[in-house]
Amino acid sequence: MSKRNSTKNDIKLSDVGVAQWMDYQIILQEWKIGKLSSEIKNSIVKDMSSLSEFRGQSINANELESMIGDWSIYPITNKFKIIALWKIIENHRNKHNLGYILKSNVLEKTNKSKQNNNGFNGHKGNFSENEIRKTNNYRIIKKQKIEFEKNNKNTIITRKNNNNNNSNNNNNNNNNYNQKSNTTMDNNYSDDDYQNEQNEFEEEDYDSNDDENDSHDENENFNIIKPKTTNQLKRKVSSSFTNNNYHVNNNNNNNDNINNFNSNSNSNTSNNNNNNNSDNNINNNNNNNNNNNNNNNNNNNNNNNNNNNNNNINNNYINNNNNDSWNNQFQNQLMYCNNYQAQYQQLHPNHYQLQYQQQQQNINNNINANNNNNNNNNNNNNNNLNDSTPNNQTNNDLKSSNHSNYDFNYNTNERLSHSPIQTHSSSNNSTPSNQSPTFPSNYISQNANINYNPNQGSMFYPPQQFYVESMFYQQQLQQQQQQQQQIAQQPVSQQNNNVETNQDNVQQQ
């Protein structure tokens, strides 16, 4: 291959297309890096090892070409490695005058000696002078690049449709979803409107700086799949709010509580009837769970008070049922709780039976502890039964711990006993213990601002509770580390005494 003038025929940074890092991968695959001398390749490897993109990776100078080929399989994941290697090789090309390491079939040659009948230059194919020839590797990477840009636009359109149609879906799904499956949820929004929006995004210029300055994970763009039609998208969104079966696999018969939520959201013409039905569904668990032979009179009074509290809670929820943000939050929490519950049930199949028993005990304890408060508020709650507007009494009921079908602190210590984190008792200084720490009953109410609807069922774990428990574990571990540092600063003789006392404490426990 004859040498070509590097200043004329070589590929420059300004020649790179829209998504620069994708073109970097194309050019890296076409360079004959394996033909370089061992000294230059070792220098490239040395520069790569000094960068954070290649930290912890063993790089062989003789395997640079194969490594670049592996990057083409997952170009999005290796985006920053591709950019870093491009810059390193550019520096070495300028330093060592490596203007001829391109393969012979990369640059398109112009045959100016051959002319046609019209006096113009000979046919050059579909490529202008000094452009990259469409080799096999180029076609593969170019296809990935086009799909990347297309997915970016589809992701933006999908997110925009979700935001614009949430209110329409939530207002119309109760009346339209029970009709034919192909019925459009919103007649004002057609497939033609969707196509017009897509054309508007295609006309906009794609900013290449968004790829380089984007600090988020690029893989999240490929995890979002756009539905085929707008109707399919709307049915998908509405089904999560109107379907009467959430496929919650548990052993505690929470279908009554879940159907209570559905009955409230699926009634637009007979709210009073549905309110009575939902109250009956909620209070069935109360009547079934509070069969205590020793406290029949107290339980009857408490059940009446709980009925009034539940009426206030349901009235408050019905008035705020059109809150789109709350619906979206509930959907996310429901998915999170279902996934966690399914995984936890596989690890601890017998845990839910213990949890159910502990829940019943906590319910009875709360009833006995709040007898006086419920008796004093009985008259106020009865006055609020026919009032559908939220008031101060409703807010107090939401904050009260006397909800027999959802106890926030139920079985917390038993669940913590399964945790893999080994904590230390705070009563003995730096004494290890095999028992789980006692979780304070008022810890959550003091350290978390929780806005959670109790009608969602007793088996739904709120994500806020896991956050608070993790903070509790973190405090325990910090106390342990501080105690160990204090022991390390003491003299050796005193450390031995502390170790002996710690061992005695362990034996006593």
Swiss-Prot record:
Region of interest: Disordered: 112-131, 152-325, 365-457, 488-509
Residue stretches of biased makeup (Polar residues): 228-242, 398-422, 443-457, 496-509
Biased composition (Acidic residues): 189-217
Feature: compositional bias, Low complexity: 116-127, 153-184, 243-325, 365-397, 423-442
Coiled-coil ranges (or none): none
Highest taxon in the source lineage: Eukaryota
Identification of the protein by name: Putative uncharacterized protein DDB_G0267716
